[in-house]
């Protein structure tokens, strides 16, 4: 499509975040197309738009998260809807082939991408799809995408939320949180691994630390221990398990609380510590192992996040990333852990578009390359 204003990039508008496990895609669907533009629009562009917006599933693994669609927003001076699509990184060659089949390269479009896969698969985009990637730093994209999504209305809903009464499971409930004044903020991005950023303004942020023990670790260990085939299956098993069957607690060692150092009896003293005993190994279920794996990974992330928040003197910690997708269990664990161990000084925050900020940040980079 020819746009009269040369400052605007040509359609279609995409942003990609190619992670170690998932590819996240943000796609802007214009809804203010003029009669002249529609007449000039080439068939391949119509085909791409129709394919992406009329389906909620693509092949056997691609998913459009319809509930996250942002309706009627303005981007680069155009009105449209912002769609969010994800699929496993291992299926990326199929996506590239689809782009080739739909003559994507004839549109002379700019494809902005971030994440490690933007480097790893750059040659595949060029050789299979005749497409050229413009690579963007993933932490820059994460921060820019997060701040942008938080600044636009989520169709009248709150983007940011927390769990009230996190220490009381029966009273714990999701509540909206006003993030209009977001700084300073500690951002904990949980993907295959974990990166932690201290954000002091839209242009002032740094990576504080990270850990290799993230969502990929949870799924990898769960697959080994239980034979599960997917993230969703691993979470389903974890929701039915009891981690204390595998973990050794403070009370297992002290017979109760360790009062001198303020350690309650229910706290985990040793993750999977009970698995050194033959009778415990024989009685533990796959669901228990899945739950213990989830608790181990989540507690570790929460502990590191808390230490970073204290060191950086930041009391709001926002957790993002696809590890938290459909994973209320971990969100509540993080909320509880931060609230308890900080004696109420730290608040765990979450965002509805948890895993898509990198893709949105890449999309926002389009005008720089058009």
From Swiss-Prot:
**A molecular function GO annotation:** ATP binding
**So, what pathway does this thing act in?**
Cofactor biosynthesis; coenzyme A biosynthesis; CoA from (R)-pantothenate: step 1/5
Active-site residue list: 138 (proton acceptor)
Cite a single Pfam family from the UniProt record: Fumble
Question: Which UniProt keywords are given for this protein, alphabetically ordered?
Answer: ATP-binding, Coenzyme A biosynthesis, Cytoplasm, Kinase, Nucleotide-binding, Transferase
Question: EC number(s) on record?
Answer: 2.7.1.33
Q: Which Gene Ontology terms describe the biological processes this protein takes part in?
A: coenzyme A biosynthetic process; phosphorylation
Q: Where does acetyl-CoA bind?
A: 192, 195, 207
Q: How is its activity regulated?
A: Subject to allosteric regulation, exists in two distinct conformational states, a catalytically incompetent (or open) conformation stabilized by the binding of acetyl(acyl)-CoA, and a catalytically competent (or closed) conformation stabilized by ATP-binding. Inhibited by acetyl-CoA and its thioesters which act as allosteric inhibitors and compete with the ATP-binding site.
Query: Per the record, what are the reactions this protein catalyses?
Result: (R)-pantothenate + ATP = (R)-4'-phosphopantothenate + ADP + H(+)
* Cysteine disulfide partners in this protein: none
List where in the cell it is found.
Cytoplasm
Q: What is its main location?
A: cytoplasm
Indicate the quaternary assembly. Answer: Homodimer.
What family name appears in the similarity comment? Belongs to the type II pantothenate kinase family.
> What protein name does the entry list?
Pantothenate kinase 3
Which species expresses this protein natively? Bos taurus (Bovine)
């Amino acid at each position: 499509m020819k746009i009269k204003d040369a400052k605007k990039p040509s359609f279609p508008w995409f942003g990609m975040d190619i992670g170690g496990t998932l590819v996240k895609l943000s796609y802007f669907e214009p809804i203010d197309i003029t009669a002249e533009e529609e007449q000039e629009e080439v068939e391949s562009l119509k085909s791409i738009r129709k394919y992406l917006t009329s389906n909620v599933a693509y092949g056997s693994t691609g998913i459009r998260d319809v509930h996250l669609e942002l309706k009627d927003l303005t981007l680069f001076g155009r009105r449209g809807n912002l769609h969010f699509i994800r699929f496993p990184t291992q299926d990326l060659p199929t996506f590239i082939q689809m782009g080739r089949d739909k003559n994507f390269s004839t549109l002379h479009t700019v494809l902005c991408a971030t994440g490690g896969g933007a480097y790893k698969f750059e040659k595949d985009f060029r050789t299979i799809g005749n497409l050229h990637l413009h690579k963007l730093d993933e932490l820059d994209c994460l921060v820019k995408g997060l701040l942008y999504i938080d600044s636009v209305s989520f169709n009248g809903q709150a983007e940011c939320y927390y769990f009230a009464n996190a220490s009381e499971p029966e009273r714990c409930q999701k509540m909206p949180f006003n993030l209009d004044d977001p700084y300073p903020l500690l951002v904990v991005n949980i993907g295959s691994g974990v990166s932690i950023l201290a954000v002091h303004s839209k242009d002032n942020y740094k990576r504080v630390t990270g850990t290799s023990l993230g969502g990929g670790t949870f799924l990898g260990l769960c697959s080994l221990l239980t034979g599960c085939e997917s993230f969703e299956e691993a979470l389903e098993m974890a929701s039915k398990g009891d981690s204390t069957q595998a973990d050794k607690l403070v009370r297992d060692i002290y017979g109760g609380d360790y009062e001198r150092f303020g350690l309650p009896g229910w706290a985990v003293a040793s993750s999977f510590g009970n698995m050194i005993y033959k009778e415990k190994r024989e009685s533990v279920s796959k669901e228990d192992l899945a739950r213990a794996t989830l608790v181990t990974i989540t507690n570790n992330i929460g502990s590191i996040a808390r230490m970073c928040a204290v060191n950086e003197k930041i009391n709001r910690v926002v957790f993002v990333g696809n590890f938290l997708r459909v994973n209320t269990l971990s969100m509540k664990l993080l909320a509880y852990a931060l609230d308890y161990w900080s004696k109420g000084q730290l608040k765990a925050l979450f965002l509805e578009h948890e895993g898509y900020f990198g893709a949105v940040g890449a999309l926002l980079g389009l005008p720089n390359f058009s």
